[in-house]
Structure formats: C-alpha cells, structure tokens
C-alpha cells in the first residue's frame, strides 16, 4: 500500500476548524466517558482515542499543558509522554496484533499537523497489504 487512505476522516478534514477552543484542552476538561475518548490520564499527559482514526487502534498521547512544540514542555512531561507511548504500543500489540506502527508527532502546519497549537504523539498500528 503506497498511501494510507481513510475515507471516514473526510468529516474531520471538512469540519475540524469549526471547534471552539482547543480540541485537546476541551477533551481533558471533561469527565471521563465514552464521549471524550480518554483511555488513560497520567500526571502530565493522557491517552486519547483518535475520533477520526487512520486505522483501528489509532491513539494519541497528549500533554495536559497547551504547548505547540515538544521543546516547550518540561523534561518530565516529555518523559511521561514517551512512557505512555511505549505502554500503548505494548497494549496495542496484544489487542490488535499489528505488524508494525507509525509513531510520531506532526509539529507545525508544514509537517501536516491537524491541531498545530497543541503538540501530541500519534500511535498508528499498521498491517501489510
């Protein structure tokens, strides 16, 4: 597969700028429920399911602090984000049995960030074919 195309993401692509405030700050301010999609809250960051996933199991690790780039976060927050990312990959391997992962952050508009004002790490399980 040369391109990862998820047609169900068109709703996000066409409407993502209609959200009042920051989607990640809004999510973390709500109580945990199926509606806000938060799977885990740590001390400095949380794990949230992607509402418009590229694949099943697409998760994001998001700091509670509203910062646009990783280097604006303190070392403890960056460390917790990487620990949560690793734990997510362990769990996803057990549940989804992916053959690989795409993991990373799109920082800035030129890098393809959909929410460029609040840095976050994507964890996308992948399979061949």
Regions found by a protein language model. Name each.
Residues 1-129:
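HIT superfamily nucleotide-processing domains
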């Amino acid at each position: 597969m040369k391109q990862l195309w998820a047609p169900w993401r068109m709703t996000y692509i066409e409407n993502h700028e209609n959200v009042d405030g920051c989607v990640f700050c809004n999510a973390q301010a709500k109580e945990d429920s199926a509606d806000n999609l938060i799977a885990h809250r740590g001390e400095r960051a949380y794990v949230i399911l992607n509402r418009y996933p590229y694949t099943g199991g697409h998760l994001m690790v998001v700091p509670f602090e509203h910062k646009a780039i990783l280097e604006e976060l303190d070392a403890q927050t960056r460390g917790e984000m990487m620990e949560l990312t690793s734990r997510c990959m362990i769990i996803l391997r057990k549940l989804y049995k992916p053959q690989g992962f795409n993991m990373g952050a799109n920082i800035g508009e030129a890098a393809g960030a959909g929410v460029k004002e609040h840095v976050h790490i994507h964890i996308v399980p992948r399979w061949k074919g």
